[in-house]
């Protein structure tokens, strides 16, 4: 469709610009919006690799609810939707997006995607970075490792957000 072609041209332009700014280095994009575009992205960029870092829904959904609540507060011209509506929409959206994503990832060759539990990655990021490079058949891990170590060291005091899922939603 026309809208899809427009999106592809715009997205391609952004990626080319980012690649130019980064002197042609391979891009790593962290974009939750791309979770629902996996198949489209793979068709546009057949050599693309996907890292699916997933969380338990009880951790994911409260974060999504928080994001939507903030967006409603910041951008809503009328009275924001009641919290129950935001909760229902968040749960439904997460379920639909991740069902689709899981199906699309399962259709790919193993060397084109990797699934990693967020909690496992946080426990041993260096091991999982190595595993990502191996499974996706990426080159340059040895050269990148010192940069990973420096970055991970800089994040030691990072405090994660902790949102709780209310019992009535479970």
Go through each PLM region and give its residues.
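Conserved phosphate-donor/acceptor-positioning beta-strand/loop module used by diverse small-molecule
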Residues: 30-31, 41-66
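Extended, H/D-rich, highly charged conserved domains that either
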Residues: 1-7, 31, 38
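PAPS-dependent sulfotransferases, especially Golgi type II membrane carbohydrate sulfotransferases
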Residues: 2-9, 15, 19-22, 65-170
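Short, well-ordered alpha-helical microsegments
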Residues: 35-39, 125
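Short His-Asn-centered micro-motif
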Residues: 28-32, 118
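Loop/turn-to-beta-strand initiation segments
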Residues: 23-26, 49
């Amino acid at each position: 469709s026309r809208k899809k072609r427009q999106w592809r041209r715009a997205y391609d332009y952004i990626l080319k610009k980012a690649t130019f700014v980064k002197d042609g280095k391979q891009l790593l994009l962290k974009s939750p919006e791309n979770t629902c575009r996996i198949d489209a992205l793979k068709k546009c960029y057949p050599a693309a690799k996907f890292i699916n870092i997933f969380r338990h829904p009880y951790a994911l959904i409260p974060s999504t609810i928080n994001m939507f609540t903030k967006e409603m507060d910041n951008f809503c011209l009328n009275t924001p939707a009641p919290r129950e509506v935001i909760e229902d929409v968040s749960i439904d959206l997460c379920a639909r997006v991740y069902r689709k994503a899981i199906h699309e990832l399962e259709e790919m060759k193993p060397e084109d995607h990797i699934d990693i539990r967020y909690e496992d990655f946080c426990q041993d990021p260096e091991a999982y970075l190595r595993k990502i490079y191996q499974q996706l058949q990426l080159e340059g891990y040895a050269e990148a490792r010192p940069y990973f170590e420096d970055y991970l060291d800089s994040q030691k005091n990072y405090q994660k957000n902790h949102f709780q899922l209310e019992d009535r939603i479970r």
